[in-house]
Amino acid sequence: MSKIIGIDLGTTNSCVAVLEGGEPKVIPNPEGGRTTPSVVAFKNGERLVGEVAKRQAITNPNTIISIKRHMGTDYKVQIEGKEYTPQQISAMILQYLKSYAEAYLGEPVTRAVITVPAYFNDAQRQATKDAGRIAGLEVERIINEPTAAALAYGLDKMDEDQTILVYDLGGGTFDVSILELGDGVFEVKATAGDNHLGGDDFDQVIIDYLVEEFKKEHGIDLSKDKMALQRLKDAAEKAKKELSGVMQTQISLPFISANENGPLHLEMTLTRAKFEELSAHLVERTMGPVRQALKDAGLTPADIDKVILVGGSTRIPAVQEAIKKEIGKEPHKGVNPDEVVAIGAAIQGGVIAGDVKDVVLLDVTPLSLGIETMGGVFTKLIERNTTIPTSKSQIFTTAADNQTAVDIHVLQGERPMAADNKTLGRFQLTDIPPAPRGVPQIEVTFDIDANGIVHVRAKDLGTNKEQSITIKSSSGLSEEEIQRMIKEAEENAEADRKRKEEVELRNEADHLIFTTEKTLKELEGKVDEADVKKAQEAKDALKAALDGKDIEDIRAKKNALQEVVQQLSVKLYEQAAKQAQAQQSEGKKDDNVVDAEFEEVKEDK
């Protein structure tokens, strides 16, 4: 049975972990980093993922960042004349994580637990699951990020009862969840959040400030210059991180622009106080969901035993101060905010595989679910913060006489009117026998599985006719599209493998040419001239093949040269052996003479 890996698929960074010998371990990427930037780039037909993609983002407009913000929408990325969905881009990141997890474990990996923000709706969860499938992973479970963090924190504290608040501020999303821990049960009491608030927004306020200051000084708007903007983004992110440890930082961007007098440089000092002033409204925005979650759970700040901080953005001192002030407790610093979610996902993988015993995870649905009823009203069937998996039925009837079909419009959200909520899907129940309005009885049942994915069915109780759907949002992919994308992803992986093989082959060939030249120099005058000429010709043939694109030709010429060099080496060794033998026999004669002299000396004595 292959191992189940845990993946934190983040907006800015992703992380992968696995359970080994009962202990969760974060798997480092090929560069040695424990997290991998969620960045994909395309360059000359080649695909770059992670650190290498992030490094060249400034100069390459075909670089995609923060794709997670578009999951569950019909957003498309146009690159080199081809269209990509957010699911495909996310799948490329997942494929990369999968590949280095396989290299680390030394076996194929096909199963994963992937985390999502607790506040992700059904379309976003479905898109994440599809991304996993495209990457060649069987997604065993979609788990909420704060819940995963609580699992990682609480696994070794199962004997104590406590109420914990997980404050998760990532690169692009914000979640807060309140959980009760006790006797191995992790029960989510309430969850709230904002899917469009995160570290990217903190970077943005610094960028806006730098653009504004530069405009005041030089009259040039840097936000119109794509390359300057990418440099500003990198500088803003760096400044934000530095201000978590120091009180002020220097931002220096030489040659950021130019006017008629020559090049212009951006030199600025940013203090922590100024950054806090610029981002105060963002910090305050995170407090709304905190209060909402407490209210939904029926708790006061005094009832919270521990505050767990998750996500790189929680390193910002103003964020820590705000949550401390709100809850009245110092946040717990015992977990790594960048890795804890992936570790929790790996533990959940262990629970599914049966390697972790006595752990029960009870999560909740973040948003209410229901259908549109007469007058455009949103009628809730399942309230938010209901423990999942769950099922709920309600009986509805027709709105007009002799109505033979009903449209079921499935929605998710908290607003009273249907139009203000998120449409998850629509389907129709037909062939209802004509009857006066109010007579037919139509039972609508909602099921939410452990992944938070919704299944709905409607049944006419008179005829027992039933119609059901697993929600596929307007942005959802059809089975054909998923299969096509899986095939493309496999082909890309194959192309990547071939490209890697080609690079390795070219390197080996280069190295062989170098060693052959060295060997031929050493062999001058020691072996037959015809043999040297043969090796020289084979070497030149390989050099010529390297200039071409025919991989099989390079391989054949490399093997031919290797054979010639081997034969040369054998001949060299044979000659060396003959010489050594000749010297040995000469030496033996000399030895006899020496012995004789030595004996004579003895006799004289």
Swiss-Prot record:
Q: Phosphothreonine occurs at which residues?
A: 173
Secretion signal span: none
Q: What induces it?
A: By stress conditions e.g. heat shock.
Organism from which the protein derives: Anoxybacillus flavithermus (strain DSM 21510 / WK1)
Which residues lie within the region annotated Disordered?
Answer: 575-605
Function per UniProt: Acts as a chaperone.
Q: Which PROSITE patterns match?
A: HSP70_1, HSP70_2, HSP70_3
Which Pfam family is an annotated match for this chain, by its short name? Answer: HSP70
Instruction: Give the matching InterPro entries.
Output: ATPase_NBD, Chaperone_DnaK, Heat_shock_70_CS, HSP70_C_sf, HSP70_peptide-bd_sf, Hsp_70_fam
Similarity-based family: Belongs to the heat shock protein 70 family.
- What keywords appear on the UniProt entry? ATP-binding, Chaperone, Nucleotide-binding, Phosphoprotein, Stress response
What protein name does the entry list?
A: Chaperone protein DnaK
GO MF, one annotated term: ATP binding
> Which residue windows does the record flag with biased composition (Low complexity)?
575-584
From the record, give the transmembrane residue ranges: none
Q: Is Phosphoprotein found in the keyword set?
A: yes
Listed Acidic residues bias regions? 593-605
